[in-house]
Amino acid sequence: MRILLASTPVINREIDFNLQTLLEYMKAYRGKAELIVFGESILQGFECLCWDYEKDRSVGIALEDAPVRRIRAAAKEYRLAVSFGMIERRGDHLYSAQLTIGADGELVNLFHRVSVGWKDVSQTDEHYREGERFEKFTCNGKSFAVGLCGDLWTEGRPEEMKALQADVVLWPVWCDYSPAEWNAAVKYEYAQQAARCGHDVLLVNPFCTDPTATD
């Protein structure tokens, strides 16, 4: 199975830009890959929230909203499965989510991050939620499981992930290490951690092009 890990430019809170970038990558790699995987919070950017729920709820995207519909339509048109991260609005709650959509445009899996590192716990309330567990699903004949960023660094979670025995573990992250840090040590730490989580673990990180961002 040909899986493309797309490290794409992201601008915080610029959903139109981020969505267009995602769609352009899908179009460019149709016929060249069977699944294209984007990083954590690709649609809104990792630093898109301010922890004021009345403001943040307008940043969240529901499964029925136009951006998701457009991605589903593109997956069907290009016959290309896609997995991407976003802040999902579900009722009165927000989640850091990873959606996987099949080449028929149908939702294959919806994963909610299980660790709290996506939010400022000192400023958030019950509106900001996490999922409970990892789960295995099938796409194009292979079994997959998803863990978002800090999920696979959380005590007990690597063992939980490995126990699923998925063919492929998708590990979308949002990291801001300098090239020197990454190449000197951090990439080896991630490789060691990935080995604890499964046989084939695929890490993908977007890159932030927002000049006002802190990273």
Q: Where in this protein do the model-derived segments appear?
A:
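Glycine/Thr-rich phosphate-binding loops of Rossmann-like dinucleotide-binding domains
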Residues: 13, 46-47, 179, 211
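Active-site beta-strand/loop signature of hydrolases that rely on acidic residues for catalysis
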Residues: 18, 27-54, 75, 82-83, ...
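CN hydrolase (nitrilase-like) catalytic-core segments centered on the catalytic cysteine
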Residues: 63-81, 153-215
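A short acidic, glycine-rich active-site loop
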Residues: 56-69, 126
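Active-site catalytic loop in hydrolytic enzyme cores
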Residues: 61, 89-164, 177-192
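N-terminal phosphate-binding loop and adjacent alpha-helix
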Residues: 7-25
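Short Pro/Gly-enriched beta-strand edge/turn motifs at strand-loop
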Residues: 79-85, 113-122, 202-206
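Extreme N-terminal starter segment of soluble prokaryotic enzymes
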Residues: 1-5
